[in-house]
């Protein structure tokens, strides 16, 4: 598995110009459709007066009137222009207009032209013949042999429809009968023929498609790809608009080398909360080249995301993902996980919240994908947390209290299980004046463990009862200084020094948890935290509560910021810090868990916006123990608009740093990652995304992508080519020098019905195992 150590490689593409593509394309498309002139009337138009103008009129009161020569009839939003019009009135509530010869009809929804028509002036119904029509204010036009118009529907015989503009026959749909539902925003067709450039390519006895941007049930645009690993991939989604507050998508994926996969996704928003319920299921995976023999050929994923607030102060959060096997995300592209994640989270939390306290019960489990150790992380169920806050405890002091009860269980019979009871009172006394702030904090960690030996006979012995009490004292000084003279003219400089002292006595914690399986962490839920400038000022080196290292240390750091005097915007910042250990920090008697040196790594963070459209970020760590660089990364981005971006990235991790922080290291050398990506709208119709990632230490490419989108007013096309690092096939060599790739190719077309003008850039940037990420720490 080399994907987790994948790296970037330089990819530079120059672009000539950019525009707000979506807005420009929409403007160009709508510029060529008719628009309603004047102010739209929303009142009941049946009771509004009818205005008639003509060159000549012969009126036979009260039953008949004949008008000829430039006849114009107006009532509310609708207007009629005709050569000759005869109006008959059999009764006060029965008035009809016969349009003889050529006519034009227009209201706020449709414009039509044809020969001979009958209009009911009382009900707004109309019967037309040999007509061409164009929707008003939106794309959509067609022809019909005959039709019946009502305020709710337009029923057409031997009709056609297309969202393409005039003189563009890229695609059209013809049907024996068509019903356009005006308010609902969709059309139904019977005996429909789909044509491309007037050539019929598809027939359906029934078809439904949208006329606007309202959600409608129906078949969505399919996708077709080819992969050297999976073969031909055909994806056909179906959308079901169940109700205004819930819908679903059913996607059927066909892999020529694997079989059929069914992917349902249900979305809801109810009084019981909002969320997503989804699944992916492949009954029989035929591709055993990438599936171990002991792995079931039934591949599946289940995902549930739910948020709920109820009874004012209660909140429920569920995030649950489960997969059939550890290689699932390596074999299938999924919206609910990525091959680089390393695990699937299974978590729930029910909480009660008040201004001064909160109480919650939760559970957490991790479905890990590593195959290095049969022992997996601990499952926490239940975990009960209590927090209490009081701002005015003694004068200006602040008191807080944290308590937790947690049960840890492991699926491995050789691992111990435990109950943990923890209490943590905290008192903060701040001293603030115009020189700065000094915060004095005292804290007590009080923990009690009830441990149980694993059920296997070979399980290691553990101490059944264990109590650990650790006091802590912390002083944290911060101030903000404004320089009288900045280093650079036109900028205001701010200096933010920070000095922190932390003291905790040493307690041997080697009896907490297992001693022989540190690959799952230390104790039950602790792991060494990655360090950067901001983490230097954390209280602890380890996550969780099972490892609380001794501390007698001083952390010193400073940040300086430069602000543009004219705009007030932050332009540049840099932060430098280091921790000095007055005594080594320990959690047990092992040297590997101790800070032998007197000082930590130097940490540097910097951000620079040297132009409004340019951003630069860098971080660096120098390990004083190793006497070499341990971590470094840099990112440079040019982003002139929301859909135009160019980014270069570099990341370095020292091999010794990896060995120090991981109990296993299959990489065996430094990580050196370099690469770049570009997403650019070349014109209003053409958008491109390209990326290349390379491991310069191993001299191997990790991922190369090229995606090209062509957009018009009524259709779009996407070309996608990729070469991606994939997992090692079963039985193949698996060393740091062996790489295996999956080549992908696809061309997809999408019909547009006049409500989507996007360039597709967001979708293109999210593709790949290393998608686009924007992260710059500047205000």
UniProtKB/Swiss-Prot annotation:
Family annotation (InterPro entries): LipoPS_assembly_LptD, LptD, LptD_C, OstA-like_N
Keyword annotations of the record: Cell outer membrane, Membrane, Signal
GO BP annotations listed: Gram-negative-bacterium-type cell outer membrane assembly; lipopolysaccharide transport
GO (cellular component) term, any one: transporter complex
Secretion signal span: 1-23
Compartmental location: Cell outer membrane
Protein family (similarity comment): Belongs to the LptD family.
Subunit structure: Component of the lipopolysaccharide transport and assembly complex. Interacts with LptE and LptA.
NCBIfam families: PRK03761.1 (NF002997)
HAMAP family noted in UniProt: LPS_assembly_LptD
Protein name per UniProt: LPS-assembly protein LptD
Organism: Haemophilus ducreyi (strain 35000HP / ATCC 700724)
Gene: lptD
């Amino acid at each position: 598995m080399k994907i987790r150590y994948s790296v970037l490689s330089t990819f530079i593409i120059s672009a000539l110009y950019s525009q707000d593509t979506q807005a420009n394309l929409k403007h160009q498309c709508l510029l060529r459709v008719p628009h309603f002139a004047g102010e739209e009337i929303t009142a009941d138009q049946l009771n509004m007066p009818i205005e008639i103008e003509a060159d000549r009129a012969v009126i036979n009161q009260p039953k008949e009137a004949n008008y000829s020569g430039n006849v114009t009839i107006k009532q509310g939003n609708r207007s009629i222009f005709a050569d000759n019009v005869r109006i008959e009135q059999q009764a006060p509530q029965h008035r009809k207009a016969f349009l003889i010869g050529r006519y034009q009809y227009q209201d706020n929804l449709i414009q039509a032209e044809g020969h001979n028509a009958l209009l009911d002036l009382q009900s707004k119904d109309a019967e037309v013949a040999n007509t061409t029509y164009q929707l008003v204010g939106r794309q959509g036009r067609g022809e019909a042999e005959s039709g019946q118009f009502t305020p709710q529907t337009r029923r057409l015989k031997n009709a056609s429809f297309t969202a393409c503009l005039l003189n563009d026959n890229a695609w059209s749909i013809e049907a024996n009968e068509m019903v356009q539902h005006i308010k609902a925003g969709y059309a139904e067709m019977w005996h429909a023929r789909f044509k491309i450039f007037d050539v019929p390519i598809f027939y359906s006895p029934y078809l439904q498609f949208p006329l606007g941007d309202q959600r409608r049930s129906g078949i969505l645009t399919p996708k077709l790809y080819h992969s050297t690993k999976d073969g031909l991939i055909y994806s056909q989604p179906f959308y079901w608009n169940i109700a205004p507050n819930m819908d679903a998508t059913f996607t059927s994926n066909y892999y020529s080398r694997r079989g059929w996969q069914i992917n349902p996704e249900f979305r809801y928003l109810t009084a019981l909360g909002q969320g997503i319920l989804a699944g992916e299921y492949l009954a029989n995976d035929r591709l055993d080249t990438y599936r171990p023999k002991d792995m079931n050929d039934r591949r599946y994923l289940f995902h549930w995301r739910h948020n709920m607030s109820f009874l004012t102060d209660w909140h429920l959060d569920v995030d649950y993902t489960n997969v059939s096997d550890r290689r699932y995300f390596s074999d299938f592209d999924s919206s609910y996980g990525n091959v680089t994640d390393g695990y699937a989270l299974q978590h729930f939390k029910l909480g009660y919240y008040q201004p001064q306290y909160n109480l919650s019960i939760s559970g957490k489990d991790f479905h890990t994908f590593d195959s290095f150790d049969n022992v997996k992380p601990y499952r926490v169920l239940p975990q009960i947390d209590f927090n209490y806050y009081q701002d005015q405890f003694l004068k200006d002091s602040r008191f807080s209290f944290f308590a937790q009860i947690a049960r840890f269980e492991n699926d491995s019979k050789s691992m111990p299980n435990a109950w943990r009871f923890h209490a943590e009172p905290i008192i903060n006394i701040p001293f603030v004046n115009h020189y700065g702030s000094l915060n004095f904090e005292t804290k007590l960690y009080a923990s009690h463990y009830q441990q149980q030996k694993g059920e296997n006979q070979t399980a290691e012995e553990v101490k059944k009862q264990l109590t650990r009490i650790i006091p802590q004292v912390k002083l944290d000084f911060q101030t903000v200084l404004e320089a009288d003279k900045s280093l650079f003219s036109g900028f205001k400089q701010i200096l933010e020094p920070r000095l922190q002292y932390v003291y905790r006595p040493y307690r041997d914690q080697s009896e907490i948890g297992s001693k022989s399986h540190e690959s799952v962490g230390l104790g039950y839920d602790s792991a060494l935290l990655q360090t950067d400038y901001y983490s230097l000022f954390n209280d602890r080196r380890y996550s969780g509560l099972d490892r609380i290292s001794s501390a007698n240390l001083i952390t010193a750091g400073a940040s300086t910021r430069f602000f543009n005097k004219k705009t007030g915007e932050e332009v540049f910042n840099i932060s430098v810090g280091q921790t000095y250990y007055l005594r080594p920090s320990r959690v047990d008697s092992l040297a590997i868990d101790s800070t032998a040196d007197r000082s930590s790594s130097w940490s540097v963070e910097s951000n620079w916006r040297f132009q409004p459209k340019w951003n630069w970020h860098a971080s660096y760590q120098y390990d004083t123990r190793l006497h070499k660089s341990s971590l470094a990364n840099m990112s440079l981005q040019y982003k002139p608009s929301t859909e135009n971006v160019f980014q270069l990235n570099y990341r370095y991790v020292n091999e010794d740093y990896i060995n120090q922080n991981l109990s296993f290291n299959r990489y065996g050398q430094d990580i050196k990652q370099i690469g770049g990506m570009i997403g650019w709208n070349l014109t209003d119709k053409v958008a491109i995304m390209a990326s290349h990632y390379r491991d310069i230490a191993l001299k191997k490419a990790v991922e190369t992508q090229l995606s090209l989108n062509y957009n018009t007013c009524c259709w779009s096309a996407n070309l996608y080519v990729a070469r991606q690092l994939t997992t090692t096939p079963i039985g193949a060599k698996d060393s740091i020098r062996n790489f295996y790739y999956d080549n992908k190719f696809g061309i997809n077309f999408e019909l547009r019905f006049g409500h989507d003008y996007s360039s597709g850039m967001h979708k293109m940037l999210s593709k790949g195992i290393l998608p686009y990420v924007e992260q710059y720490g500047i205000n």
